[in-house]
């Protein structure tokens, strides 16, 4: 089944108001914070592949994201860089999750963003979280700094985990930030957590 530019595996699972946890390579995956966070949560909910881009070459320059060759049991496999979607359910709470392993697009960014939003809308997502890490001048002798944007209820829950105050960053950013901006306009609760 196609949703935007994503090919979704069939049979398509019935998910009840899933929460999306997204990460973005390579821009905000410093120290593999996003990759490791998603991996840990995916293991705890026994995540399975839901889909991936049908034609990743529409969005990615394969001279920048290099394809790889892998040999398993003497068989060579060609692996094309892609954006992947996984899903899982927390058995204790019954909460469904969707995990977005996104890559920074090199072309047709607007179509890429529209495809991500289409997936989120198709599955009636209740919340969208983006997690990652970014370079910063933080001394090794101090605890890591976590910044982000959370609604007031969530800010109260995390207490001193994240630095208080309004975001003040100005400068280069990712086109993928438009995902959260668009989802907020659709009244989907969006949060971001970045480790520095």
List the model feature ranges, each with a label.
Residues 29-36, 107, 111, 170, ...:
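Conserved active-site and cofactor/substrate-binding residues in soluble primary-metabolism enzymes
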């Amino acid at each position: 089944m196609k949703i935007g530019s994503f090919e979704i595996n069939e049979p398509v699972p019935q998910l009840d108001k899933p929460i999306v946890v997204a990460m973005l390579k390579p821009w905000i995956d410093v120290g593999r914070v996003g990759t490791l966070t998603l991996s840990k949560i995916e293991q705890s909910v026994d995540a399975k592949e839901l889909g991936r881009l049908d034609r990743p070459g529409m969005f990615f320059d394969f001279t920048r994201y290099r394809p790889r060759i892998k040999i398993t049991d003497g068989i060579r496999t060609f692996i094309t860089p892609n954006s992947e979607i996984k899903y899982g359910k927390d058995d204790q709470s019954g909460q469904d999750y969707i995990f977005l392993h996104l890559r920074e697009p090199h072309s047709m960014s607007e179509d890429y963003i529209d495809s991500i939003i289409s997936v989120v809308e198709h599955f009636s997502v209740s919340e969208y979280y983006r997690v990652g890490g970014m370079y910063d001048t933080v001394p090794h002798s101090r605890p890591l700094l976590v910044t982000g944007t959370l609604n007031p209820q969530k800010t109260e829950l995390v207490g001193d985990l994240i630095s208080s105050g309004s975001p003040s960053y100005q400068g280069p950013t990712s086109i993928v930030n438009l995902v959260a901006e668009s989802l907020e306009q659709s009244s989907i609760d969006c949060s971001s957590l970045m480790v520095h």
